[in-house]
């Protein structure tokens, strides 16, 4: 089994993968405000790498997030469709985080993309990566990377503090079937 020891090794793994760098470049070149490759796109890449599977999985959605109050829901869908047309080799999911709080019970509007990621259901999903114009990579992981590196799935503090959100968390986990692909996952409700 592969091991990653620190953030630099993780970033190097992304940098060395042609598909991930192509995706990150596409996202950067869209010039959307506060944009990131996030959630399962980043988490699954690391889990695959640690499991000695091909790191890039063409079946994984490319979760692109951004935060722009001036871009409507309809415009976001149009941008997502354009991505799918222009780069059909990837499974694009484009979400403006301005609107996404509506999918999480009793949640205030997010302030920015990092605020949104910090309130994702699982700590291992609360992660984002972006490529800057100077070619540096930035990794955002508000709860650290330990849960990802240890194949641990547990709720974020935001989900833990509300019973309705915890029900959504449980429902989500029951649909994901992650353990079929990554056998050594452990699940916790705390």
Model-inferred region functions:
Residues 1-190:
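Catalytic cores of the polymerase beta-like nucleotidyltransferase superfamily
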């Amino acid at each position: 089994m592969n091991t990653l020891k620190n953030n630099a090794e993780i970033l190097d793994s992304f940098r060395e993968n042609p598909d991930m760098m192509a995706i990150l470049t596409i996202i950067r070149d869209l010039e959307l405000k506060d944009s990131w490759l996030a959630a399962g796109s980043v988490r699954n890449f690391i889990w695959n790498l640690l499991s000695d599977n091909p790191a890039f999985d063409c079946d994984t959605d490319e979760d692109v997030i951004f935060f722009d109050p001036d871009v409507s829901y309809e415009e976001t869908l149009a941008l997502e469709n354009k991505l799918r047309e222009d780069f059909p080799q990837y499974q694009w999911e484009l979400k403006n985080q301005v609107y996404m709080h509506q999918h999480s019970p009793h949640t205030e509007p997010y302030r920015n993309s990092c605020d949104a990621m910090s309130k994702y259901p699982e700590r291992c999903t609360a992660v984002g990566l972006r490529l800057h114009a100077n070619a540096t990579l930035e990794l955002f992981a508000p709860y650290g990377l330990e849960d990802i590196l240890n194949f641990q799935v547990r709720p974020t503090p935001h989900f833990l503090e509300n019973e309705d959100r915890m029900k959504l968390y449980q429902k989500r986990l029951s649909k994901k079937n992650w353990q079929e692909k990554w056998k050594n996952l452990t699940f916790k409700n705390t």
